[in-house]
Structures are given as C-alpha cells and as structure tokens.
C-alpha cells in the first residue's frame, strides 16, 4: 500500500478510474455515467461504476492493508492527512469550480462546502490526543475502569450526492487517522 497521496492528482486522461490500493484502476464494467452541467446541459465528465468483482477486490485490498495500517503509530498515520489537506487547499478553487459545474452550486456555497470538508480533515489530524485511553480506579467498589480504543477494520461510506466536497470528509479522514482502512 502506498502512503504517497500526491499520485491522486496525476490521472488526467479522462478515463473513468477508481483508486484502489495506491493505484488508479480502469473500470472494466459499465462504462459509467455522464456528469452533466445542470446550467448548460453539457456532458463534462464520466463517473465510473465498478462491478461487484471490482468492489470485492477493493474491499479485499483494504482488508489486506489493515493489519499493517492499524499497527502504524498514530503520529505516522496522520501524516498522509497533512498531505491530503495540503492538496485540498492547493486545488480548492478548481474543486469549487467542479462543484459549481457538476451541482449547480454558487461559487460561495461550493467554497464553503470545501472549507467545511477541510476543517474535518484538520480535526482528524488532531485525533491522537482524543485517542488516549482512559483509566479510572475505583469507578465503583473494587472496580477499575479502562477504556481501550482499537481500530475496527475496513470502512466504507455511501454518501449523498448533494455535498460531495464535505460529507465524504465526515468519514474518510477519521477512519484513516484511527487506524482503519477505507
């Protein structure tokens, strides 16, 4: 599994692809669906639809990466999130323009949505301090209490279409920072 997320910005040939296990994979199934600018009716892109087999492969890849990722020290796990945040900020204007053309949002709304998404990445970067396990002696007579936080495994999110610059960032950075794969 690669931890260099800079390659996320490297595919620009117009082919619908999914990002799995550190690689861009061409979708073998359905050719995807047109993305239409609601203001003009013009087709501006295509989005891929993965086959069931491709989804199963993505889940298997995430499952394979999980043991190593959960064992990665938390300070190391958040490093890709710093890179991700920097990329989001670097490309914020382009991403906002994409939201405007794909969803008919105003520029102000699109920029605000992205800012709120970036704020979630910032919060996830701060997760190590919140992950400290607690221990309470004598919570009740002869009872000590200990909280243990452990990664759970593979996470996925099916998010609504209306806030694509924000809602996925309610899930992905927190899952990754806490040692889960996504």
Can you annotate each of these PLM segments?
Residues 1-39:
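Hydrophobic face of amphipathic alpha-helices that form TPR/SEL1-like repeat modules
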Residues 18, 25, 100, 122, ...:
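Short glycine- and Lys/Arg-enriched binding-loop motifs that mark or flank ligand-binding interfaces
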Residues 27, 109, 164-167:
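Secondary-structure boundary/capping motif
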Residues 34-35, 52-55, 165:
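A short local loop/turn or secondary-structure capping micro-motif enriched for an aromatic residue
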Residues 42-131, 142:
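Glycine-rich loop-to-alpha-helix module at the N-terminal edge of alpha/beta enzyme cores
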Residues 134-182:
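Conserved small-residue-rich beta-alpha loop and adjacent elements
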